[in-house]
C-alpha cells in the first residue's frame, strides 16, 4: 500500500468513460430563455455507444432521445458545429457511488450534467456549464470544436 491507496488501485488505473459531445446553442422560443447569454440558451449532449451515439436533448415538455451513427467523435462534432453552436468534445465522468441530493430545477443543464456525470453545484445556466468545463477546476479535459469545415451526413438508426 502506497500513500493510503490499495495496491490493486495502483495496478488498475481508472477506466475512461464513453466519449461525449456537449452542444451549446442559441434558442429563444421562450421569453425566459431570452434572458440567458446569446449562444448559450440551450444545451444537449451525445454519448457514444459502440458505433452509435445517443442524443439526449432535454426540451421544455419532454426529453428527446435519438440514435445516430457517425464514424467518430471528431466527424460528429464537425457535423454539429454550425453558426450559433459550440461543441465540446470530452467523455462521461465516473459515476460516483454517493451523490449529494440535488434540489434544483430540472433544466437542460441539469439533465446534461446528470447524463455526463458532471458535479458542479453552482452551475445553473448553459454558459456557466461551458465555463466550468473549460475552467482549470474541471476534473477532466473538454475541448472546443469550431464551425464545420466538412459536411458529414449522419444516418438515423431505428425508427
Predicted ranges, named:
Residues 63, 68-111:
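Aromatic/basic micro-patches that form nucleic-acid/chromatin recognition or nuclease catalytic surfaces
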Amino acid at each position: 500500500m502506497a500513500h493510503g491507496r490499495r495496491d490493486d488501485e495502483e495496478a488498475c488505473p481508472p477506466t475512461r468513460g464513453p466519449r461525449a459531445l456537449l452542444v451549446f446553442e442559441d434558442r429563444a422560443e421562450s421569453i425566459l430563455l431570452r434572458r440567458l447569454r446569446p449562444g448559450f440558451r440551450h444545451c444537449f449532449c451525445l454519448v457514444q455507444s459502440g458505433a452509435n451515439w445517443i442524443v439526449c436533448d432535454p426540451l421544455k415538455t419532454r426529453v428527446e432521445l435519438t440514435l445516430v451513427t457517425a464514424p467518430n467523435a471528431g466527424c460528429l462534432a464537425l457535423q454539429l458545429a454550425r453558426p450559433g453552436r459550440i461543441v465540446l468534445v470530452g467523455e462521461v465522468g465516473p459515476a460516483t457511488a454517493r451523490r449529494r441530493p440535488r434540489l434544483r430545477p430540472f433544466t437542460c443543464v441539469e439533465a446534461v450534467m446528470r447524463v455526463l456525470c458532471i458535479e458542479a453545484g453552482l452551475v445553473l445556466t448553459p454558459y456557466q456549464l461551458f465555463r466550468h468545463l473549460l475552467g482549470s477546476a474541471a476534473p477532466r479535459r473538454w475541448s472546443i470544436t469550431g464551425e464545420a469545415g466538412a459536411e458529414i451526413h449522419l444516418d438515423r438508426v431505428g425508427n
